[in-house]
Amino acid sequence: MRKVVLLCLLVFSIALHAQEHSENNTMENPFKNGTEIRSLSVEIGPSWINSKVYTSEGEFKLQAGVELGVEYAGIKVGGIDYGISFYHNETNIHGCKVSLNYIGPSLTYAHLFHQKWLGKVSLGLGLGTAQGKDNSYNNHAISVDKIQFGLGTRLAAGIVFLASDHIGFGLNLHDMVIFFGKKDGSYFGDSDEINGISRIGGTLVFHYFF
């Protein structure tokens, strides 16, 4: 807990310093319509597996985990640009550790609501992987200690506070789904369910613009 508090204080002090620097900077605001900027971002926050999880003890849903993400993206204010993102999720379900990964390209639309507030919507399509680590648990087609590969989709929307020309702090809400393909004999679930796993979440984001 002490480390978390110290980290929050450090981030807060950086934000104040960046804001002070921005107010003293008389250069033209780079975040205007038509401007193309590169962004490197890191994010962390809670997430929930919102598809059914079948175990030897019954069905579970909305299982909480932790989401980590890194994204390199172009931001065209008032337009669409592209990027690439990687996300990793860890969820513990009654002793079963489920690891989910996503990597793929994305398209991002950005809109400047105010001189200091930037909105973003992203859509991605890429590779998804899943792995479960407990021999008595399964999540749909997730096999124990075996990495499952599938088609991953990502939809995200967020808001960014532009602390300076190069620093931003934001909040993202996202939905990710991994489709594993055709069902087989190892599938756990109802006949009308897809063979896949989905999760929703919210993350705090640190942006570096250049």
Task: Show where each model-derived region lies.
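Outer-membrane beta-barrel and related beta-rich outer-membrane complex signature
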Residues: 54-56, 96, 133-135, 183-185
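Extracytoplasmic loops and strand-loop junctions of Gram-negative outer membrane beta-barrel proteins
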Residues: 51-53, 90, 138-143, 186-190
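Hydrophobic h-region of N-terminal signal peptides that target proteins for export
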Residues: 9-17
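Positively charged n-region of N-terminal signal peptides that target proteins for export
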Residues: 1-4, 19
